[in-house]
């Protein structure tokens, strides 16, 4: 893939030969598969009953909700080149879902997915719809961070610290299992609100893809496997962001994932990534302090200066719409972070705008 084919490179106006361009080249897998995810979601040749016009209209709205008018204009231009399909109750239900996933993903319930089904959305289309909304949430944060690193102006910039978000604490899942009420580093389970695809429903080639990524026995990944090409690109993007050498230490990438999960209210994701951060950093008490932050509390309080600036940036990037500013980048550089490390921090945070919105709105955690 050349930079001429890379949407984020174009919209963020990344100078060829700059440190940012070099960092993205170093993280080639993340760069290629973020673009691959975009191309796969917006090709609309995946056999799912979800038209390209519907996809582009949803993407335009999601990009605007997340404060990126340039990305919204990109999707609008693509949409305007297609015949008008009109507005339908089915589309209105999808827009409602998109707005919920954008602003209050932790408020989603099983009833919301039932409403989508009643409006005519198939199970495969619901998964693809959720992937699209979550992916555009990821795109907007990638673009914002690249623009900031490149010295460009951004919308809605603020130096105000972003507080921890709301989370569900009902104590019971939709199926009646015990659900966690607080953030924890303990291992949790997760159950879907709509049926995962059974393993025998995948053909041999598809089963091999699931097996290659270790997804065979996971209800979550077999649910996302209802659109396997998108899942494959998403998984490769994940690996390109988190499983690379050099740059930001892995423990701090896990901290970024935890911060995003605290902002979005995703107890399950935070349990996985806070536990990993503790294992790698040996700073279990500091990580616990982070996840113990109550709604409205400031996540960086009581942390080391290096972690404070990273947490503040990750929180600001995770807000909807994001508020991360040039001042955040300046403080990261004052703490000695290189451009590659800042890219790693930004991409780790941005990816959990995607991951949280799937985990929170397609199912829920249990602890029994």
Language model regions located:
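Hydrophobic alpha-helical segments
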Residues: 1-368
């Amino acid at each position: 893939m050349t930079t001429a084919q890379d949407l984020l490179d174009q919209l963020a106006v990344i100078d060829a030969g700059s440190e940012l361009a070099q960092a993205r080249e170093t993280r080639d897998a993340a760069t290629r598969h973020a673009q691959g995810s975009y191309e796969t979601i917006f090709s609309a040749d995946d056999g799912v009953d979800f038209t390209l016009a519907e996809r582009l209209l949803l993407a335009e709205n999601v990009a605007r909700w997340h404060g990126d008018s340039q990305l919204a204009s990109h999707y609008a231009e693509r949409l305007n080149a297609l015949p008008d399909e009109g507005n339908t109750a089915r589309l209105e239900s999808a827009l409602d879902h998109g707005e919920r996933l954008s602003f209050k993903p932790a408020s989603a319930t099983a009833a919301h997915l039932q409403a989508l089904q009643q409006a005519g959305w198939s199970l495969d289309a619901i998964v693809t719809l959720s992937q699209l909304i979550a992916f555009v949430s990821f795109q907007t944060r990638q673009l914002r961070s690249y623009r900031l690193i490149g010295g460009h102006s951004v919308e809605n910039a603020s130096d105000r610290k972003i507080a921890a978000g709301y989370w569900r604490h009902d104590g019971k899942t939709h199926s009646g299992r015990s659900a966690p009420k607080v953030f924890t580093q303990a291992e949790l389970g997760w159950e879907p609100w709509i049926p995962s695809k059974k393993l025998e429903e995948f053909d041999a080639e598809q089963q091999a893809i699931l097996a290659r990524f270790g997804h065979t026995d996971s209800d979550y990944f077999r649910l996302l496997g209802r659109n396997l090409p998108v899942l494959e690109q998403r998984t490769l993007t994940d690996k390109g962001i988190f499983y690379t050498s050099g740059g930001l230490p892995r423990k701090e990438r896990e901290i970024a994932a935890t911060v995003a999960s605290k902002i979005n209210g995703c107890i399950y994701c935070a349990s996985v990534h806070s536990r990993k951060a503790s294992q790698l950093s040996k700073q279990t008490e500091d990580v616990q302090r982070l996840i113990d932050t109550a709604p409205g509390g400031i996540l960086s309080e009581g942390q080391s200066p290096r972690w404070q600036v990273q947490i503040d940036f990750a929180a600001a990037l995770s807000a909807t719409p994001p508020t991360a500013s040039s001042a955040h980048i300046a403080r990261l550089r004052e703490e000695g972070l290189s451009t590659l490390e800042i890219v790693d921090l930004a991409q780790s945070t941005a990816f959990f705008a995607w991951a949280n919105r799937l985990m929170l709105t397609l199912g829920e955690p249990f602890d029994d």
